[in-house]
UniProtKB/Swiss-Prot annotation:
This is SsrA-binding protein. GO terms for biological process: trans-translation. Its main location: cytoplasm. Required for rescue of stalled ribosomes mediated by trans-translation. Binds to transfer-messenger RNA (tmRNA), required for stable association of tmRNA with ribosomes. tmRNA and SmpB together mimic tRNA shape, replacing the anticodon stem-loop with SmpB. tmRNA is encoded by the ssrA gene; the 2 termini fold to resemble tRNA(Ala) and it encodes a 'tag peptide', a short internal open reading frame. During trans-translation Ala-aminoacylated tmRNA acts like a tRNA, entering the A-site of stalled ribosomes, displacing the stalled mRNA. One of its GO terms (molecular function) is RNA binding. It is found in: Cytoplasm. InterPro entries: SmpB, SsrA-bd_prot, SsrA-bd_prot_CS. The gene is smpB. Transmembrane segments: none annotated. Belongs to the SmpB family. GO terms for cellular component: cytosol. Keywords: Cytoplasm, RNA-binding.
Length: 164
């Protein structure tokens, strides 16, 4: 029975959730991977895909990083003896060197730390990809939209030229 479940988890998608808004609102200079400190009911809810990263961010407190604003909806059948708080702040598991680097950049240069995606690593560990970057201004967003539209138009033109 265990072998069936192991095969099923290997074949299933490793991605759990993506923060699509993050790439639109921020220009990332650096990305890194962090572990998450979770409770049992949270892991069960994540396996069922009940995660929302859209309004979440990472903040530093006492030299440690915490994920705030990430909603993990509790399952009805999960835990009856523990009070489930879907919006609690969750500790990120990073090395001291990484934490010091993040703290320095956030304090001095005005960078923000934003979660980009959440995924399974080796089928058992929940990891989160965080990005260190600055917020885009309105004209930066317009430039990105123009570039994207130009790339689409260029691809259409090339496709028509190849077909003729």
């Amino acid at each position: 029975m265990a072998k069936k479940n192991a095969k099923k988890s290997k074949n299933s998608s490793a991605s759990i959730a993506r923060n699509k808004r993050a790439t639109f609102d921020y220009k990332f200079e650096e990305k890194m991977e962090a572990g998450l400190s979770l409770m049992g009911w949270e892991v069960k809810s994540i396996r069922m895909g009940k995660v929302n990263l859209s309004e979440s961010y990472v903040f530093m407190r006492d030299g440690e990083a915490f994920l705030f604003g990430c909603t993990i909806a509790p399952l009805n059948t999960a835990s009856t003896h523990v009070v489930c708080d879907p919006m609690r702040s969750r500790k990120l598991l990073l090395k001291r060197k990484e934490l010091d680097k993040l703290q320095g950049l956030v304090d001095r240069k005005g960078y923000s730390i934003v979660p980009i995606s959440m995924y399974w690593q080796k089928g058992a560990w929940v990891k989160i990809e965080i990005g260190l970057g600055k917020g885009k201004k309105e004209h930066d967003k317009r430039d990105d939209t123009k570039d994207r539209e130009w790339q689409i138009e260029k691809a259409r033109t090339m496709k028509k030229a190849v077909q003729q």
